[in-house]
């Protein structure tokens, strides 16, 4: 079992599932959400449009997950999750972000998926501070692997050097604390 930090395009990974940092409409957007929609092809948008709305314009509330096929991606599945918009850290943002990771891992386990790739959820337009988000991502994935067998391979995908360094620093800090 391992956690890997990888810098590059999440849509290129050959894993069982990639996690999409989506918006509540699931209709595509900017950042990683737009990249995943473009790479997966038009059938992804059709699949997202077919998902029921829980209230007008909302198919996936913050912290929840919806599943689609991977379509034109190497990944077989896409887990769409909506991370919190950063306000000031006092409106349950850390708990909501942690829940995005935990619920994705729980669903991967239920589906017996062995590999999962996460983007830096909420770190783009949603404005979550990168180092805090990286610490949450590492904590949640490490805690999961301590008590679960699946998924065996977790990839934290960095879209740039700053994100890569933040993940590496969070991993190193946890390794030092665990020693």
Swiss-Prot record:
GO terms for molecular function: O-acetyl-ADP-ribose deacetylase activity. It holds the Pfam family Macro. It comes from the Bacteria. Residues 1-175 form the Macro domain. SUPFAM superfamilies: Macro domain-like (SSF52949). Gene3D superfamilies: Leucine Aminopeptidase, subunit E, domain 1. InterPro entries: Macro_dom (IPR002589), Macro_dom-like (IPR043472). PANTHER family: GANGLIOSIDE INDUCED DIFFERENTIATION ASSOCIATED PROTEIN 2-RELATED (PTHR11106), MACRO DOMAIN-CONTAINING PROTEIN (PTHR11106:SF27). Belongs to the MacroD-type family. This is Macro domain-containing protein XAC3343. The lineage of its organism: Bacteria, Pseudomonadati, Pseudomonadota, Gammaproteobacteria, Lysobacterales.
């Amino acid at each position: 079992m391992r956690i890997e930090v990888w810098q590059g395009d999440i849509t290129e990974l050959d894993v069982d599932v990639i996690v999409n940092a989506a918006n509540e409409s699931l209709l595509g957007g900017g950042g990683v959400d737009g990249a995943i929609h473009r790479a997966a092809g038009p059938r992804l948008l059709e699949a997202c449009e077919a998902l029921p709305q829980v209230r007008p314009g909302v198919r996936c509330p913050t912290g929840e997950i919806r599943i689609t096929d991977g379509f034109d991606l190497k990944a077989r599945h896409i887990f769409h999750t909506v991370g919190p918009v950063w306000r000031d850290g006092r409106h349950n943002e850390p708990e909501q972000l942690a829940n995005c990771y935990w619920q994705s891992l729980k669903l991967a386990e239920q589906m017996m998926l062995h590999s999962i790739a996460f983007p830096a959820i909420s770190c783009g337009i949603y404005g979550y501070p990168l180092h805090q988000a990286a610490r949450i991502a590492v904590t949640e994935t490490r805690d999961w692997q301590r008590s679960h067998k699946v998924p065996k391979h977790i990839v934290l995908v960095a879209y740039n050097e700053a994100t890569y360094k933040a993940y590496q620093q969070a991993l190193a800090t946890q390794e030092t604390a665990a020693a």
